[in-house]
Amino acid sequence: MYNADVLAFGAHSDDVEIGMGGTIAKFVKQEKKVMICDLTEAELSSNGTVSLRKEEAAEAARILGADKRIQLTLPDRGLIMSDQAIRSIVTVIRICRPKAVFMPYKKDRHPDHGNAAALVEEAIFSAGIHKYKDEKSLPAHKVSKVYYYMINGFHQPDFVIDISDTIEAKKQSLNAYKSQFIPSKDSVSTPLTNGYIEIVEAREKLYGKEAGVEYAEGFFSKRMLMLDHDVLGGEQ
């Protein structure tokens, strides 16, 4: 078992990088232990293959500096509420034992992203129940902080994190997914192959401008936030 600072869940490999790649790189710079879990193998993606996607995901995790990347095999486009799915995610949570869990924001054009969040929320609750049995009979674990990152779209976040120093790492991690974002003569045209990385960069640029920095990623919090600094910007 691990004692992770952060465990970030995505429905598909590349979700986490899109939503919070810069923040992961920032956490790693701060010597935080960060782990990623992809719920599906993205086997229904229009481009690439499962084996290639795994290679790309491993490279993206290396670029960001994540300590570990876990691959579950829940069905792509089949992230429905089930005991088996929840139990699999509970096992991951109890293995990683994170302080904070990040997951996709529910308001998203892709149903898998919202469904992933619903499953992870259920698993977080069950992971803290001592009598709930996971796949490995691990001890219960209560997650302290729960946050949501954005994949598709632009929403007014609860807070943003400055990623001005790590935006390049984020872009490099996305470019590791050549099969998804870089069109080729054999690729199918999708929203991802039509300037998607540039769109994500523009979004983070806008969040940064609104917050007074160059780039920022936006998040939602399950609970009300207590700031570490006062409204005048000084340290408490």
Swiss-Prot record:
Its cofactor is Zn(2+). It holds the Pfam family PIG-L. Belongs to the PIGL family. Zn(2+) binds at residues 12, 15, 113. One of its GO terms (biological process) is bacillithiol biosynthetic process. Its EC number is 3.5.1.-. Involved in bacillithiol (BSH) biosynthesis. Catalyzes the second step of the pathway, the deacetylation of N-acetylglucosaminylmalate (GlcNAc-Mal) to glucosamine malate (GlcN-Mal). It comes from Bacillus subtilis (strain 168). InterPro entries: Bacillithiol_biosynth_BshB1, GlcNAc_PI_deacetylase-related, LmbE-like_dom_sf. Disruption phenotype: Mutant shows a 2-fold reduction in bacillithiol levels. BshB1/bshB2 double mutant does not produce bacillithiol. GO terms for molecular function: deacetylase activity; hydrolase activity, acting on carbon-nitrogen (but not peptide) bonds, in linear amides; metal ion binding. Keywords: Hydrolase, Metal-binding, Zinc. It catalyses: (S)-malyl N-acetyl-alpha-D-glucosaminide + H2O = (S)-malyl alpha-D-glucosaminide + acetate. It is an enzyme of class 3 (hydrolase). This is N-acetyl-alpha-D-glucosaminyl L-malate deacetylase 1.
